[in-house]
Amino acid sequence: MSCSRNRDALTSRPVSIELISKYRTELMGIAMLLVVLFHGYVPQTSWFYGLKRMGNVGVDVFLFLSGIGLWFSWRSCPNLKHFYKQRFLRVYPTWLLLASCFYGFHFYHKSGFSNDVFDLLGDVTAHLDFWLHGELTFWYIPALMALYLISPFYIQLVNRNRLYTWLTIVPIVWCCAVAWIAPLHHALWHLEIFWSRISIFLIGINMSPYILQKKELPPNTRPLLWVMFLFPLVVACYLEQWEHGHYPLFINRMLYIPITISGVLIASEALQHTNKVVKQCWAFLGSISLELYLLHLHFILVPLQRHHLNYFVTLVLCLAISIPLAMLVQCIVSFTLKHINR
């Protein structure tokens, strides 16, 4: 009887958009786990392949939540110099440390990542090989920093006139152009992974005023949220399982947009009714997500996969090794920055 009352109370409540901000760090933790699941190796012949590939949506969740965070950051201090400094200090020192370790090691061993000293400097400082050739080792960080650069101008634009939120359509049209117009495809297709993620980042910025205003969706929105989560998820999963390699991957990123928005709203509501300890675990993962992202794949997971262990065993080992290292890197960077700022 009490379970029935709780269920009725939940379904009769409006859907609170504000919960996205309240549980932003926890959602970052969930997104990080999805990315780790995505990076684990499963052969394309496996029944689990398509589902595993859905972990890629974790990147879109990161960008969506980053857009929200940047809007609130700009609102608290609308100063370009302060904004860029805060964003730079949040990402760049960690990136510089780990990129130097990775590319320096491979340059020393002539592993093929950097051809000469200038190439090495370009990779370490700005991951130039991503922008020039589509080298994806740590693509997310330079892509994120590029979005940081444009975000204050977009925020001011949409704050001035909400009609500019329609600009989120432009990257989608641009992806179609780059996919099928030959000169653009030849010159810019290597950046598809970036172009196709711009829209979800801008949508995060667009939604932020509604979070601030504590907007709510009516209770009967819930079935629609589940439809908008499950329908594109099933389609994307099918495409990855049965059609992977036969269509431009940006199609999947377009499907990730409704999956991300509806999924984040559903997950936010679930977190509201989740055990405190579980929430703390997700928040902890979210608090070291930058370090985990940079460490888990090329430093830990790739070497582990050479041992051909079970998929889930490999991922558990990867997390068991990556989490303490991520905490250590975070401590080193924080300690260094504190001493520099003295």
Features from the language model and the residues they span:
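Transmembrane helices and adjacent periplasmic/lumenal helix-loop junctions
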Residues: 145, 296-297
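Membrane-interface micro-motifs in multi-pass membrane enzymes
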Residues: 23, 56-60, 133-145, 190-205, ...
